Amino acid sequence: VNSLIAVGSIAYDTLETPFGRRDRALGGSAVHFSLAANLFTDVGVVGVVGDDFDGEPVLAERGIDTSGIQVVAGGTTFAWEGRYGFDLNVAETLDTRLGVFEQFDPQLSEEQAK
């Protein structure tokens, strides 16, 4: 049983900074929140991804309950692309593709509903 459930976006982020570029980095509000909160308590995540998603092991390896991640066959995972200058507090959005997140209807897994 999870002490905390994070519901939100699970995404792939493509980031460009003056220091380099990273393609398809695991991102999204539910991911970032889960990774941080998991340092203090048991966390479950609820979100939706396409069948192109391969980031679930990253969360599971850290003990995060991924049973609430819905995988939509034939769909694509939410993706965001942005650029940062030397002020890393300011992001410029270059592209946003909602993919399956556009139709997201959050559902707790049976285990998470306990």
Residue map of PLM features:
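Histidine-anchored nucleotide/phosphate-binding helix
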Residues: G28-N38
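Extreme N-terminal starter segment of soluble prokaryotic enzymes
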Residues: V1-I5
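Conserved N-terminal subdomain of the carbohydrate kinase-like
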Residues: Y12-R24, F40-K114
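Active-site metal-binding loops of divalent metal-dependent hydrolases
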Residues: G8-I10
